UniProtKB/Swiss-Prot annotation:
Function: Deubiquitinase that plays a role in several cellular processes including transcriptional regulation, cell cycle progression or innate immunity. Specifically deubiquitinates histone H2B at 'Lys-120' (H2BK120Ub), a specific tag for epigenetic transcriptional activation and acts as a regulator of mRNA splicing. Antagonizes DNA double-strand break-induced ubiquitination of H2AX thereby participating in the maintenance of genome integrity.
Protein name: Ubiquitin carboxyl-terminal hydrolase 49
Keyword terms, alphabetized: Chromatin regulator, Cytoplasm, Hydrolase, Metal-binding, mRNA processing, mRNA splicing, Nucleus, Protease, Thiol protease, Ubl conjugation pathway, Zinc, Zinc-finger
Top-level EC class: hydrolase
Gene: USP49
Family: Belongs to the peptidase C19 family.
Transferase in keyword set: no
Provenance organism: Homo sapiens
SUPFAM superfamilies: Cysteine proteinases, RING/U-box
Amino acid sequence: MDRCKHVGRLRLAQDHSILNPQKWCCLECATTESVWACLKCSHVACGRYIEDHALKHFEETGHPLAMEVRDLYVFCYLCKDYVLNDNPEGDLKLLRSSLLAVRGQKQDTPVRRGRTLRSMASGEDVVLPQRAPQGQPQMLTALWYRRQRLLARTLRLWFEKSSRGQAKLEQRRQEEALERKKEEARRRRREVKRRLLEELASTPPRKSARLLLHTPRDAGPAASRPAALPTSRRVPAATLKLRRQPAMAPGVTGLRNLGNTCYMNSILQVLSHLQKFRECFLNLDPSKTEHLFPKATNGKTQLSGKPTNSSATELSLRNDRAEACEREGFCWNGRASISRSLELIQNKEPSSKHISLCRELHTLFRVMWSGKWALVSPFAMLHSVWSLIPAFRGYDQQDAQEFLCELLHKVQQELESEGTTRRILIPFSQRKLTKQVLKVVNTIFHGQLLSQVTCISCNYKSNTIEPFWDLSLEFPERYHCIEKGFVPLNQTECLLTEMLAKFTETEALEGRIYACDQCNSKRRKSNPKPLVLSEARKQLMIYRLPQVLRLHLKRFRWSGRNHREKIGVHVVFDQVLTMEPYCCRDMLSSLDKETFAYDLSAVVMHHGKGFGSGHYTAYCYNTEGGFWVHCNDSKLNVCSVEEVCKTQAYILFYTQRTVQGNARISETHLQAQVQSSNNDEGRPQTFS
């Protein structure tokens, strides 16, 4: 066996009986043939071809390694094979050299049948008369051992000269070199960790550093106040060199959980990884128009006409502090130092009384995509959410889907009010940029549905265009059955395409509740007769595709009167989604096939079994680095797309591969198509 893991734990005693040739006999049967010495204790026993006392010793004590005292073979009873490797200390090689040296010494002690005879009285060896045949077996044994060693040496040299032997030697050298590199890397990591621990031990804790940073300048003389962060004069150059680490990938920034805020962190991570949404807020500069954003008043928003520059000054001051820290070498990947530095950028509360979600998104996205920070605490963002969206105030667990809808609605309201109320006070460049941001917010998730109702009496079709910002998909009926004996939900799978097909399938309206325009066209308005009601069918189809398709899987169902439970079935979804089967037929002929292709961009996952509890995480695709990231609050891990597709998705985000201006057909063309279809059918048909 080339590699035995039990040899690494070998610890041989210095007074072992194997080093004394007079003890090379079995302690049970006293034979000297095929003698094996235990490498864990001083026990010596015979092999399996004699009485198998060595195996019995292993079964009793559990000592796996034994060495043949004459052939110097090492056998492992646990691996059931001969051992060819050695431990890092080289104990087996040293032991073999010692045994060869001991064997080479001259032994004058007489033996009988391989046993040394000693006197019980004097303790001296009793010399017995040796017979002529007595020396012949010893000579033959010595000659056999010599031939064995010569043959083994010849075979070893021949094997080393062969191609297979050369390859094996090269592989062994590479493994040894790799092991040396790993050991060197481990040694360097231990040294870096030791130096970091020494440095952190001499640095003030995070809380005191934050309080010192927020101390007013006029609170006391500069000499009497201790510095919040070590300056370049006090820190050695070697330590500064150690702190400066390579820049991180943009977007790989965790968000600290501030108390059941995982729903907010997961949604913010998803929005920041949607490239078009992120770029429009990064280009927006709210500091120039901050006085025009609404301010909070008891949970409601109102406009302020008095301009103020406090927030702009604070924002620039925070950025200057962050850049100063970076120049001094304090932007390293240490957990404690990161927390202290990030307090410079994200305060616990907005310094200005004018609360703006757009400003907080702009600031937060800048930090997350700067490539300098591994963790940020979104205090200001949470405070703004509490002020502008009172339903999410407090530390209760909230629904991520509801938070996403409310957040986008408030951002849209804020941009619309900012662009219309104080239009003349906004610079033209910022006015144009604000319009672009509002356009992106309004259109990135916006799509349109075609609601088509068909009268069963006359087969007349009536079309209505309805907007949508996400598609809430229900599970098939078999997952809503909670009767006894039903197959458990966690043992089955559901296809995303099946849920989309259920969303766009034709459903019959219950009873005669539809007032058809065609059936009531001959009836006069002044006619006192009631409207003619008929049965009808309804179908929803996608009329206009959005740039980012949000699919909300309705996992929570009502079980009883006041209890909601979760449908824990796995939904199978692919990295590429084709929306062509779910669009109206007139739309298919007017658009390119590539327009219907969507690529998976993000997944929000709910961990847990019930509504109002559990935990939210997000899987996001980083467009800058081209990899997937699992965002679990402050912990971020790179993962594969196969890992993402195995998650229990709650909200899916798909980005349109090709965006075309002609993403929908005109309503005039649609009405013409429907009118032509109705005219071609001739007389009304009745369906049973």
